[in-house]
């Protein structure tokens, strides 16, 4: 009996070999995934059918009328059902009065023919604007001649700031930058923490630097991907030395900037809170950088003897990239697919926020609300975000696995398909989408409790006792560890499926058996490969962060350091991880293929190895490396059960 309720697919011992004649795997899960996606489409259709798309794009007034359209009357709502064909823009009486909790403007909204393009300081200015531009800014039941102090409550709050419409969304946005940034609700939200308010301002003023450095990290990641293909002993040491110099140099610069900012603040205390925040942020960053540098130096001391092993590993992986160069761009296609889906998801979320049916409020205005079970569609939509995102990432892993498996088990590399990546992708779509759907759903089941615990933790912050806090964090830690283990298991299950064409559960079981049989060698390879890739990621973060520090240092008068710098470094790490994780996947595929190769072949006529000489030499070196760590008396288990033909 197979795992997860799956029956065993074969009564005999598993014959590991790449099957040309494949069959569809996990069809039931593919059907479930398709039905789930249909549900996502139905939610989108409901939002559009209820008028949410029109209300989102064209906007609507406080009486439920959609701007730029001829509207139907809403029962018991005065001034509804108006013809606003020539009134295409939404104008707010109090555009800066935001409710950040419910994400809406607490203001009367009207449809107008033109946004005020000048400051209107008096009601006479409002009246003249209506007279000469035909755009009435007071309630619909008032004639411009009635724009007097007697009817001031039916007119916008004075002064009316000049505004312009948002492209494609037809809302009048005030040109006053202070109004854009300092929303009343946002000010209320951060009023208890003025530091947060200054940090938000710092991010807004540093947005060009943040975007520029994020693009820089993308270029550095692609460049490092190309360099690793041709890695040698010299390049490994250069990478290590550059990382060490970058860590020490970056730490020294942070301490120097901290001392400089502190001295400047002491000489001129009038610089205010922004300068004090910068000093505090620099101190925190300097301490963190110091700790990271010390840990890095210790790791380099421990790993220095494995440089030769590292070179051999990346020489082997580099050959794969030479024969399948489009592997380098696989992360780019995945990123584009994720970006497209996330844009769609956010658009539907915005549609859901404006979906529903009109309900009359006490003031006589209209609010659109969803009642009954439909009000919980956002939960379904949130699960869709996790599952489909994980599905896309799993498709990348299966595609890479299929291409590398084809490379490994093709004896004559000149007979490889013209485009192994495309061939692997077609094989995935034709046979194994159900397996990918099942694997990604398992990760989704772990992420949902994680999100619930994070939400509970944020809601109980400052209220929970020490015991509850400890238990909550322990649960979050356990789920995090479980997620990492399942991600690793999923990755190897996809590799096994690429080799044998078996279902997810069968592939996972077979992969576990192989990994357990070769646990020591797995540890050696993962330690060596992951460490070098970590150095590469760290180097990109250090270079990007260092340039960010230098640039932000010239904006010390109005920019708080901490959040812009964190955003830059996190994005740099995310981008570098996305690209360099391809190498991790390639190494994992090569290892599992090697283990299967050794288990079923011994080099004799008719049972020749698929591996090339360089891979065999690397595996022998990895065995020696682990033997030196475990001691001369700890002999590694043979790759082939019951034989010693590794």
Curated annotation (Swiss-Prot):
InterPro entries: Choline_transptr-like. One of its GO terms (molecular function) is choline transmembrane transporter activity. Keywords: Antiport, Cell membrane, Glycoprotein, Lipoprotein, Membrane, Mitochondrion, Mitochondrion outer membrane, Myristate, Phosphoprotein, Transmembrane, Transmembrane helix, Transport. Residues 49-207, 255-281, 330-331, 395-435, 552-559 are extracellular. GO terms for biological process: choline transport; ethanolamine transport. It is a multi-pass membrane protein. Residues 1-27, 229-233, 303-308, 353-373, 457-530, 581-646 are cytoplasmic. The chain crosses the membrane at residues 28-48, 208-228, 234-254, 282-302, 309-329, 332-352, 374-394, 436-456, 531-551, 560-580. Glycans are attached at residues 133, 278. Coiled coil: none annotated. It is found in: Cell membrane; Mitochondrion outer membrane. It catalyses: choline(out) + n H(+)(in) = choline(in) + n H(+)(out); ethanolamine(out) + n H(+)(in) = ethanolamine(in) + n H(+)(out). Present in myelinated structures from brain and spinal cord (at protein level). GO terms for cellular component: mitochondrial outer membrane; plasma membrane. Pfam families: Choline_transpo. It comes from the Eukaryota. Belongs to the CTL (choline transporter-like) family. Probable choline transporter. May be involved in membrane synthesis and myelin production. This is Choline transporter-like protein 1. It comes from Torpedo marmorata (Marbled electric ray).
